[in-house]
């Protein structure tokens, strides 16, 4: 519980991924089925973060959530082979991105360099250039390959995000 710091029992959690994992625990009878559907639940859970500092925390929280649900169901630690697959899915589905441009923040070089002694009107917004890399996401079901975020965004059905991690407002909505 973020307001008290008290741990919430697995069976009482109501997060988006928690609800999926609770249903999986209820309807599966074998470890293999549980692992299969838990991976599918993580595949269907996307999120991006602008700064990068909260990204590690979000990834760790997803990993710990799945591990705690596994332990709650089977009363043993999840196997390493399952955790490796899970780690890959988490790494692809939670990434760093400027949500306004669909690109990696702060990756373009400033041709003038940083002026460490100027504290006036410093523009710390990401530099957007033609060569700035586009973010890529993994299409687990339809393509089974990485695709550019712009391509996914352009599809008629689009992509919904379960989480946008971070502490807004870091982005200026007038840019991008």
Name each region found by the language model:
Residues 1-176:
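SAM-dependent methyltransferase catalytic region
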């Amino acid at each position: 519980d973020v307001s008290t710091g008290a741990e919430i029992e697995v069976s009482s959690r109501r997060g988006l991924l928690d609800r999926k994992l609770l249903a999986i625990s209820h309807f599966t009878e074998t470890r293999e089925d549980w692992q299969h559907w838990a991976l599918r639940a993580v595949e269907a859970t996307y999120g991006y973060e602008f700064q990068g500092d909260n990204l590690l925390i979000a990834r760790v929280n997803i990993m710990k959530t799945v591990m705690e649900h596994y332990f709650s169901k089977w009363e043993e630690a999840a196997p390493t082979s399952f955790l490796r697959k899970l780690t890959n899915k988490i790494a692809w589905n939670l990434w760093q991105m400027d949500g306004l441009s669909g690109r990696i923040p702060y990756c373009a070089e400033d041709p003038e360099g940083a002026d460490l002694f100027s504290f006036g009107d410093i523009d710390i917004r990401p530099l957007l250039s033609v060569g700035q890399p586009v973010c890529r996401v993994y299409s687990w079901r339809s393509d089974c390959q990485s695709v550019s975020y712009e391509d996914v965004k352009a599809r008629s059905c689009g992509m919904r995000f379960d989480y946008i991690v971070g502490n807004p407002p870091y982005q200026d909505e007038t840019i991008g």
